[in-house]
Every structure is written in C-alpha cells, then in structure tokens.
Amino acid sequence: LRSALDCAYWDLFGKLENKSFLELNSIETQQLPESSITISVAPIEEQLQKITKSDWNKFKVKWNHYDEKALDLLLKCEKEIALDANGSFSISECQQLEENPLSVQFTYIEQPMKTGISNYSHLNASKFANWMADEDCQEQTKLSDLKSHYKTINIKLVKTGGLTPALELIKEARANDFKIMIGCMTESTVGISAGA
C-alpha cells in the first residue's frame, strides 16, 4: 500500500507540473535501461526450449536447487543469462561458483542462499560470481554491510515502499559502488511501469 501511494503521489505531481519523474528528480537518461524476460522454475530442458524459442536476448532463469549439469548447459547456450537461485544454494555450492572463472558469464546470480548474514557472510564479492542481493536488500538494510559480499542489489519498489525510498537506496548504492537492478514482484503493469 505504501509503495502504491508513493507512486501515485509522483504520478499526480508529475501531471500537475507537466514533467516526468526523471525531470522532477534531475535524473539523466543517456542510456536506456535494459530488460530481460524471466524463465520460471522448470526442468532445464524446458527452460532451454523457452530460451531458444524466445525473441528476447536477455534472460533471468529461476532455480530452486543447484544443478551442475544444468549450469553447464546454460553456460553453453550462447545467450545473456542471469541466474536467480531463490535462496536454494548451499555455502559450498556458492564457494564452488565464486571460484569458477566461468561464473563471470552469468550477468548476475541472484539471492544464492537463504537470507541473513549467517549465510551471505560466506559470499565474496571480489571473486568471479556477480552475487546480487534480493531478499538480503530491504529498505532498512545497511548497504555497507553487504558490500564485501554482493556486487549488485535488486531494488523492488514494493519492498522499499515506493519511488521516494528507492531513490534514497539508489543514492546509497551508488556511493557504495553497487551495480543496481530495478526489479519487480507480482505487481500489475501500473506498478511495474513505475519502476521503469
């Protein structure tokens, strides 16, 4: 509800001022943001079939467990692939991934383990894997605590409380040299368009 009200405020303010959100916040857009399509959890053969049939060139593939064979197949598919582990990897599986030079081929690997410092403290941002914090990055999260473990954060308007707190989180993320993705959950097209 908080996110919906905040986004509605910015929409109304923009209409009253006859300016876009970007103009109101002096945000430069020299480069258009890129997007990807999400491939749901399924056997790897089905996921690869969806990737092959798609006109998209960037994909986020969702997993619910670690699978070495599937990992190799994704690395060989010659597409831009990001991996969303949904917190399903173990510490040893994450350590194996971050030591593997081929891990750099994944755009990012999102929320590899269950949330909490007891898990993400085992991730090393200076190694090969581009770890992305999702559930580990909430509105109240101190990004400086994540810095040595994650390279990228996923900012979702619904979990941050709207555009206003998201702007603050983006400023803090940039100050800490994080890469940033604006993600979504199960919002309507109206909710998703606010993030775009």
What residue ranges belong to the model's regions?
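N-terminal capping/lid subdomain adjacent to the active-site entrance of alpha/beta enzymes
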Residues: L1-I81, N86-Q95
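Buried hydrophobic packing segments
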Residues: L5, Y9-F13, A166, G191-G195
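Catalytic core of soluble alpha/beta enzymes
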Residues: V61, Y66-A194
